[in-house]
Amino acid sequence: MKIKTFVIGLTLCSGYAAAEPSDKQSMNVIPQAAQLCVSCHGAAGEGIEPLGPRLAGLSKEYISTQLQHFQAGVRQNATMMPMAMTLQGDGIEQVSSYFSAKPANDVKPVIRGEQVVFNDDTARLAYQGDWSRGLPACVTCHGPSALGGGLFPRLAGQQASYIKTQLLAWQSGTRKGDVDGMMGSVANKLTVAEIDALANYFANLK
C-alpha cells in the first residue's frame, strides 16, 4: 500500500513539473507594459526602420534611464513622450527587463595580432578618436566592439538613420541628459560627413 501511494505521488509531481514554463518560454512572453513598444521596435527589439531603433542588446540601465528622460521631458520626441507616460508602476522595469534580455548578434572587431586593422578615417575615429580636436574614440565609452554597457548604448548593428539623427540632436542641443554633457561636446566636434560615415560604419558592424 505504501508503494502505491509513493508511485501516485511521484506521478503527480512529475505532471506538475512538466506544466512549468521553461525559461525560454518565459523570455518570449511579451509583458503587458511592452506590448505597445513592439509595433515600432519589434517583438524581439530588433527595431523597425524608420519607426523605431533597435533595443535588443541595450542594457537594462540605459533603457530605463531613457524612458525616465522621456517621462520627465529631458529627452523629447513626439511619439516616445506619450508612450513613456503610459508606463506606470513597474512598467519601466517590465519594458527595460524584457528588451535588455533579448539577444543581439556578437560583434568582433577585425584584429591582426594585437592591433585593430583600420581601413579608413572613419574607423580611426571609432577606435582611436582625433585628439588634435579633443575627440575621444567612440569605443572609449561604447566598448571595444561597440556593444555598449550601463548608461552607454550599443552602437553595433543599430540603424544608421537613428545613430545619425541622435548625433545631430546632440549637436543641435535638442537631445540632453548625457553624462557631464559628453555626447553634446563630441557631436559638436564632428562634421556632417563624419556623422554620416560613423552612423553607417556602426550600423554595418555585425
PLM-predicted stretches and their roles:
Residues 13-17:
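N-terminal signal peptide c-region/cleavage motif recognized by signal peptidases
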Residues 28-38, 60, 64-65, 123-139, ...:
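Sequence context surrounding c-type heme c attachment/ligation sites in exported
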Residues 48-54, 70-114, 149-154, 173-206:
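Axial heme c-ligation environment in periplasmic c-type cytochrome domains
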Residues 34-44, 95, 135-144, 198:
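The canonical Cys-X-X-Cys-His
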Residues 2-9:
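Sec-dependent signal peptide recognition
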Residues 25-73, 77:
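The feature marks the first
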Residues 18-34, 46-51, 104-132, 153:
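Electrostatic cytochrome c docking/interface patches
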